[in-house]
């Protein structure tokens, strides 16, 4: 399952590590957009297979940032 961003911004902080088992709505990373912190959460439970961004990266709305099993 691909996880995408809902807003454009900068990856401020990564909260989850590859290989972690995530619960529904668990925070994967936090974006900074217009001086607001916006969490990107797991839409379902599963193992985090891949992170496609790192802290400091700029993302656009709809960019894939992570892959969940």
Where on the chain are the PLM-derived regions?
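Short histidine-centered loop motifs in beta-beta connectors
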Residues: 7, 13-17, 21, 50-53
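Short beta-strand-turn/beta-hairpin segments enriched in glycine/proline and small hydrophobics
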Residues: 1-10, 27-43
């Amino acid at each position: 399952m691909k996880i995408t961003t809902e807003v454009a911004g900068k990856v401020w902080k990564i909260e989850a590590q590859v290989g972690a088992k995530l619960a529904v709505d668990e925070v994967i990373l936090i974006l900074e957009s217009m001086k607001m912190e916006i969490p990107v959460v797991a839409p379902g439970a599963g193992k985090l297979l891949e992170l496609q961004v790192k802290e400091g990266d700029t993302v656009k709305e709809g960019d894939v940032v992570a892959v969940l099993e």
